[in-house]
C-alpha cells in the first residue's frame, strides 16, 4: 500500500532476509539480530512513521522466549527510533485479546499488552495499537507461518461470510489504515478489526 500511495516517498524495510519486491521507494536493510540495532541505527533517522508488524506465534514457546521476541525486541526498536525521531507516529500490530492491564492469565495477552503500554508511554508524537482478529491476505500476501497459510486455503470457501465479522480485516486495510492514521490523527488509539477497516477509508 505504501508503494502505491503518492503520500509516501520512501519505505525503509528492516528484514532478516531479502524480499522479492524491487521498487524505487524501497530501501531494504538486512539485519539478523534484532536484539542489537547499533550497527544499523544510522539508517533509522528522519522518518515520519514506523509500522511495526513483526511478531511470532506463542504456540509452543515458553514465556521467557516469547517475551524476548515480542517485548524486548520492540523495546530496542522503540528506544532507537525515539532517539532519532521523537515526532514520528508509531503503529504496532498487536492482536485481538491483548491485555493492557498486563494481568491476563493468558501469557501472550499479557506480553502484548505490556508491549502496547511501552509504545504508548514512550512519548512519540502519536501511537496506535492494532488488534485485529483474523487477517485476510490480499494481493498475493503470504504468511511466513505455514500453518496460517494452510488455514487460509481451508477457509477460502467461507471468506465471503468472514468479511462480515467485526474482528476480521485484511492486509490491504491494515496498510491503508496505517497510512491514513499517520496523515490524519484520531482519538481512538487501540483499534479492533472493524476500526482498522474504518481507518482504512481515510
Predicted regions and their residues:
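Short, polar loop motifs at secondary-structure junctions
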Residues: 13-20
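Conserved Rossmann-fold NAD(P)-dependent oxidoreductase catalytic core, especially the SDR/UDP-sugar
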Residues: 64, 68-110, 114, 121, ...
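N-terminal Rossmann NAD(P)H-binding glycine-rich loop of SDR-like oxidoreductase domains
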Residues: 1-7
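A generic secondary-structure signal
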Residues: 1, 79-81, 118, 180
Amino acid at each position: 500500500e505504501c508503494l502505491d500511495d503518492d503520500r509516501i516517498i520512501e519505505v525503509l524495510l528492516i528484514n532478516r532476509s531479502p524480499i522479492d519486491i524491487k521498487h524505487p521507494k524501497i530501501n531494504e536493510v538486512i539485519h539478523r539480530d534484532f536484539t542489537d540495532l547499533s550497527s544499523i541505527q544510522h539508517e533509522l533517522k528522519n522518518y515520519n512513521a514506523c509500522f511495526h508488524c513483526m511478531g511470532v506465534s506463542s504456540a509452543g514457546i515458553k514465556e521467557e522466549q516469547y517475551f524476548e521476541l515480542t517485548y524486548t525486541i520492540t523495546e530496542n526498536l522503540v528506544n532507537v527510533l525515539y532517539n532519532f525521531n521523537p515526532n514520528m507516529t508509531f503503529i504496532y500490530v498487536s492482536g485481538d485479546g491483548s491485555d493492557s492491564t498486563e494481568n491476563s492469565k493468558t501469557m501472550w495477552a499479557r506480553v502484548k499488552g505490556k508491549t502496547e503500554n511501552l509504545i504508548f508511554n514512550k512519548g512519540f508524537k502519536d501511537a496506535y495499537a492494532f488488534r485485529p482478529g483474523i487477517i485476510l491476505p490480499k494481493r498475493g500476501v503470504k504468511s511466513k507461518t505455514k500453518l496460517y497459510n494452510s488455514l487460509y486455503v481451508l477457509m477460502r470457501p467461507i471468506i465471503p461470510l468472514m468479511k462480515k465479522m467485526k474482528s476480521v480485516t485484511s492486509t490491504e486495510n491494515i496498510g491503508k489504515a496505517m497510512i491514513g492514521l499517520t496523515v490524519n490523527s484520531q482519538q481512538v488509539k487501540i483499534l479492533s478489526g472493524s476500526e482498522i477497516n474504518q481507518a482504512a477509508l481515510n
